[in-house]
Every structure is written in C-alpha cells, then in structure tokens.
C-alpha cells in the first residue's frame, strides 16, 4: 500500500486532536502502520496515544541542544498505542516568532531523518485551528499531505471555518495534488446537524465522510489520557471511530472543493434555522433614533 498523507483541519476547539487520535487508534487496531505529526504549539496531538500530558516537541528539543541538526530521530519520535509513531512540531513561546515555521522545520527534519521510510500506511498531520497561513498550510502547500479532512459541527463558526479551509485547499490544489477527502461531523447535538453537514458537503462538492455522535465516554477516556478505542473497545463510540477509519481507508472521493460565497453559506444557515434573516432596517441606527421611530 502506498503511504497516504492526510491533514486534519477545523475550527479551534472542534475536537480535531481527539478525533484524529481515536481515528488513528482504530487504524492501528486494524493493523495499519501510522504516524501522527502534531502541527500545533499546544503539543496535544499525541497525548491520548502516549498517555502523556504533552510530548516534548521538536522545536523545544532543538532549542535545548542548539539546533534541529543536532537532534536524532529517536529523540523526537515516540511509540504509543498500537505502535503508532508520534512527533510534535511545537513552536516558539507565545508572542514570539511564527509557530508555522516550527511546522516547516519539524516536517523537513522528519523527512531528512527517514521517519517517512518506515513502511507506513498513513501519516496524519493534526493542524492548528482554522489557520491556513503559510506555516500551518505547509502540510498542504508543500504537497506533504494530499488528503484533507475537515472536522466540523452544525455550529455556525465551525461551518465558516470549513468553508475558509476549503478556500485554502483550492489555492494549493492549483499547483499540487492536495484534495479534500470529506467533512467529519463531530456532533455538538445541534438541530438537524447531520442534514446540515450533508448539505454543506454538497455545496463544497464533497461528502460527509462520517457523523461522530456526541458521547461522554470520549471525555471519560480523555481524563485517563486514553482513546476510546483503548479505554473501552466494546462501546458504541469505539465502533463509530472504527467506522470512520474504515471509510477513510476506502475513500476514493477526493476533490478540489467548491467553496461557498458568504451569501450562499448564510442562506444555508437560514434554511436550517441556524441564522435568522437580517433586519436591514435597523443597521446604523442609534438607540435614540430607534426610540424616536
């Protein structure tokens, strides 16, 4: 099997890291060889696989020894549940420098040190928030990741983020092979959520690859720094992640997305009752003017 490189994007706080690690645990359980590369300065992309608070990052270790050239692969790569290989890029202190540079430096280091030559089936990049700036777009800009999955929900801001990320994919698809593999709905239990994300996926020219229901067992597993797959392999939520993993294994629908205009997106949100039609008659009016009317 040719190694598949996938990047997971989505709004900050949507559950990307949790979804990615549970998905990866399910792939490992299926016998797939997987590596996770955390592309977020928080360095929380591997904690459930490693049962750790946060893995030491490539950028932290490079600062300690002098430069990234002084590091060895075994210094930065840890093995976790199901023999999953884990690396965290890290970044500078908050307010200092560009964290995206850390992603670029880390991925280049892993490539040069042969981390990708280990007979891998999948590499997953867990990428910071909905930022598609130069550094964080690096996994797609440099043709590292060729498959993008966007984690979203039926909440308005999560859908805005999915649309913005799709715009970024279009930009880089013109010069490379990057494609959108689908939307993963990480449910927030909003009204008609699955229908809404299916409709959004249709607008974007893609698919909702799986609807992950909300279940408190995810939080119970997280408190123990474990994936649901490892914590309670017999529960229904573990089966949801297995289904997601199988759908990604079988996925052949990878597209250049067709992002919505803001008007189209707002029309969709109004159609599903997420957003009310704007009352244009009140725009620009002061309280005094409204009271006088």
UniProtKB/Swiss-Prot annotation:
Its cofactor is [4Fe-4S] cluster. The modification ADP-ribosylarginine is found at residue 101. Binds 1 [4Fe-4S] cluster per dimer. Pfam families: Fer4_NifH. The reversible ADP-ribosylation of Arg-101 inactivates the nitrogenase reductase and regulates nitrogenase activity. GO terms for biological process: nitrogen fixation. One of its GO terms (molecular function) is ATP binding. The key enzymatic reactions in nitrogen fixation are catalyzed by the nitrogenase complex, which has 2 components: the iron protein and the molybdenum-iron protein. This is Nitrogenase iron protein. It comes from Klebsiella pneumoniae (strain 342).
């Amino acid at each position: 099997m040719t190694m598949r490189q996938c990047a997971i994007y989505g709004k900050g706080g949507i559950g990307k890291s949790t979804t990615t690690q549970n998905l990866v645990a399910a792939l490992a359980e299926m016998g797939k060889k997987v590596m996770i590369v955390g592309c977020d300065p928080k360095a929380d992309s591997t904690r459930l696989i490693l049962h750790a608070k946060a893995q030491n990052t490539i950028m932290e270790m490079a600062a300690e020894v002098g430069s990234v050239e002084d590091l060895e692969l075994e210094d930065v790569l840890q093995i976790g549940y199901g023999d999953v290989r884990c690396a965290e890029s890290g970044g500078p202190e908050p307010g200092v420098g560009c964290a995206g540079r850390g992603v670029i430096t880390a991925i280049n280091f892993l490539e040069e040190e042969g981390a990708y030559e280990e007979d891998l089936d999948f590499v997953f990049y867990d990428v910071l928030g909905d930022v598609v700036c130069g550094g964080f777009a690096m996994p797609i800009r440099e043709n590292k990741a060729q498959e993008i999955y966007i984690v979203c929900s039926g909440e308005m801001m999560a859908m805005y983020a999915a649309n913005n990320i799709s715009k970024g994919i279009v930009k880089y698809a013109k010069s490379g092979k990057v494609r959108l593999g689908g939307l993963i709905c990480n449910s927030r239990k909003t009204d008609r959520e699955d229908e809404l994300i299916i409709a959004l996926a249709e607008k974007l020219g893609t698919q909702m690859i799986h609807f992950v229901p909300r279940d408190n067992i995810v939080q119970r597993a997280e408190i123990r720094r474990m994936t649901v797959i490892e914590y309670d392999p017999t529960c229904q939520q573990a089966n949801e992640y297995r289904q997601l993993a199988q759908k990604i294994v079988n996925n052949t629908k990878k597209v250049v997305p067709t992002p919505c205009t803001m008007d189209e997106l707002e029309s969709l949100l109004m159609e599903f009752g997420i957003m009310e039609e704007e009352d244009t008659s009140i725009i620009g009016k002061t309280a005094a003017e409204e009271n006088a009317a």
